[in-house]
Amino acid sequence: LSAEARARTVAYLPQSRQTEWQLPARTLVMLGRFPHRQMFKAPSAACEAAVDRALSAVNATEFSKRSVTTLSQGESARVFLARALAVEAPFLLVDEPTADMDPYHQIHVMEILKNVAKSGVGVLVVLHDLTLAARFMDKLLLMKQGQIVDSGTPKEILTAGNLEHVYRIS
C-alpha cells in the first residue's frame, strides 16, 4: 500500500500526545483528515462533518476553539483521540488512550473505543490498566518483554497464574 492508502486505512493514536503548536483544537483534529483532503484546498463539507463527529464523540466540542497548548492533559488526550477518529479509517491503533485522565474520562474514552469497535472498525488498544482491559475489551493479548504469553477473553487471560508470570503479582 502507498503511504496515502495506509493513512486512510489505519488511524493511530500515540501514547505521546504533546504539541507545541499554538493552534485551535479543531484544527488539530482536522489534521486527521489529511489523507482525505486535496492539497492547498479548503476542507470539504465531508471533512468538516467528520471533525464535528469526532469532537462530539469525545465531548471536546466545547473547547475546540481553544489553543491545544492551553488544554489540560485530559482535554488534550481527548482532542488527539478525536484526531484519530476523524480519519474514519477501518482500523484504529491506540496506545495508552487513558493516560493522564481522571476515572470519568477513562471510562468515557473506553466506551468510545468500544462503540467504535461495535461500528465495525478494527480497534487495537495497548493498555496496562487491567481493570479497564477486563471491563471493556472482548479479547486480550498478554505480552511480556515483547513476546506473546497468552490470548483470549479477559476471563481466560487474567488468571492468577498469568498475573504472577507477567506482572509478578499474586
Please provide the spans of the model-predicted regions:
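Conserved ABC ATPase "signature" region
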Residues: 30, 45-63, 88
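Conserved ABC ATPase signature
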Residues: 42, 67-71, 75
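Catalytic Walker B motif of ABC-type/P-loop ATPase nucleotide-binding domains
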Residues: 92-96
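H-loop/switch region of ABC-family ATPase nucleotide-binding domains
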Residues: 127-128
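A short, surface-exposed alpha-helical micro-motif characterized by mixed small hydrophobic
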Residues: 133-135
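ABC ATPase "signature
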Residues: 151-152
